[in-house]
Amino acid sequence: MPNALTLESMSPSLAKVAERARQEPEAQFHSLAHLIDVTALKRAFDRQRKDAAPGIDGVTKADYGQDLERDIQDLHERLRTKRYRHQPIRRVYIPKEGQPGKERPLGISCFEDKIVQDALREVLEAVYEPDFRDCSYGFRPGRSAHEALRTLNQVLFQGEGNWVLEADIASFFDQLDRSQLIEMIQRRIPDGSIKRLIGKCLHVGILEGEERTTLDQGTPQGSVLSPILGNIYLHHVLDRWFEEEIQPRLRGKAGLIRYADDFVILFQRQDDAQRVLEVLEKRMARFGLHLQPEKTRLIPFQRPPREQKGGKGPATFDFLGFTWYWQRSQKGHWVPRCKTRKARLQRMIDRIYRWCRTHRHQSIPAQHSALGRRLRGHYNYFGVNGNTRSLAILDKQAQRAWYKWLQRRSQRTRLTEERFVDLLRDFPLPRPRITVSIWGT
């Protein structure tokens, strides 16, 4: 997804909309479509990635930019006169995390459609960003998964997460009810042109090989627009409901932490947790959503007794690619810790192994550069306090995979361990390191 905008980087017109939305939570915006002008479309063009996969028309950013002024003017005229048509998206499949052999669909829009989606996202964000609650961290300016992890660590450390409700919404982006989504948006933005444009981005054909289909529900995964539409939906379905209707009725403290459609709810009291678990499925069903029974559970996560000498705490739970557990600190106190989820770590090891095998005949500098990018990306996300062991495992396995497949480049000259050590001096792989602090405030 392109970078979300801050108030300072918005156009003056959008900044006024955002400021009014902040000051008047009940205000309605009847006329916003004119904000998707030539300048807004150019901004959206600039935010697109150069290396993004093309849609069914094969057009890349470089292709579209060859005659940018003409193409943007033409696009704006089609939008203004309501002649714009969203082209079908190209469907591909990527592996599903933690479920070997299973895949999830991803939709790739044509480049021009990405521009329209991003310009529309910019308008929706100006209105809804002031509305969104602090419990929401995904795809929002100034917020991140690391911020969600930091909040989670703080709540657990303070003893306010004795019970953790770990929930998984089944195929959220596929099951989202479009009619209810449009109704939610209409309450804040009763602008017919915006409604029609969102509809065109949702009711879009899907091209899979030679077969074309049209889905009646959900929002295409991979769409530039899907993250904010998902946030708007869950803002109404979950965030507001929990903070306004559920929290005031609980006997102890409780908190929701959500990143896109991934969320946990933490409770001080078991009875509160059980009551919420009972009503959560009914709440989701009202909006066409369902929780996966095998992935939705209530986990006891109390801090172990001070007198407990060894071992770890009670059960563990997973959130945003990490497994959370209790561990003794160097000072002897029980503290919450997290490590890379086992399935996520193994998936990364397998990817590196396959990459080294497939690309073993490339030059050493080319392999070194590509491996370095993959490892740095992993360390930048998973390099949080206390996760050094998982990072070290990946480092060791990456070196082992590279050595194994470099050995098999040639039948005549075998790469010895000594020569591989020398090679690593000239082409060192990135060292695992802690890149993000999630401890403290």
Where are the predicted features?
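Core structural elements
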Residues: 36-42, 88-92, 96-98, 202, ...
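Conserved polymerase palm-domain catalytic core
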Residues: 78-79, 83-93, 131-302, 316
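Duplex nucleic acid-engaging cores and interfaces of nucleic-acid transaction enzymes
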Residues: 107, 111-119, 145, 163
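A glycine-rich phosphate-binding loop feature that marks nucleotide/adenosyl-phosphate handling sites
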Residues: 255-259, 296-304, 370-374, 391-399, ...
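Short, solvent-exposed helix-loop connector elements
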Residues: 105, 136, 214-219, 336-337, ...
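Non-catalytic, polymerase-adjacent accessory regions of viral genome-replication enzymes
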Residues: 1-58, 62-69, 73
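A conserved non-catalytic segment of reverse transcriptases
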Residues: 203, 209, 291-362, 376
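A terminal-accessory region detector
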Residues: 388-441
